[in-house]
């Protein structure tokens, strides 16, 4: 959590509240970290942290989007901003797929 907060601070993203969600509660077996937070402007964020050695492809982006839909449905709450932090290479089709769906993608997460 500390590493993520430091990374968010380098991007000038500051949060009042940042809670970790368990992916298994939403039917996912993916090795992904999920956080929900409220920034200083009272915007609700849904943050996915995905780290892998292999390339992040369009199939992965679809799975992440489906997982976010399940979270939104179970929480009964929509998030204004959805973000994805990736440490692996990103496929251009996956990037455009996420941008069309108005996701913020940060590909420089370490």
Which stretches of residues belong to each language-model region?
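Acidic-basic catalytic patches of nuclease active cores, encompassing PD-(D/E)XK
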Residues: 1-34
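Phenylalanine-focused residue identity feature
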Residues: 7, 15, 44, 48, ...
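Detector for Asparagine
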Residues: 9, 19-22, 41-43, 60, ...
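Conserved catalytic cores of phosphodiester-cleaving nucleases, focusing on short active-site segments
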Residues: 23-27, 33-71
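Short, compact, well-ordered microdomains
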Residues: 77-110
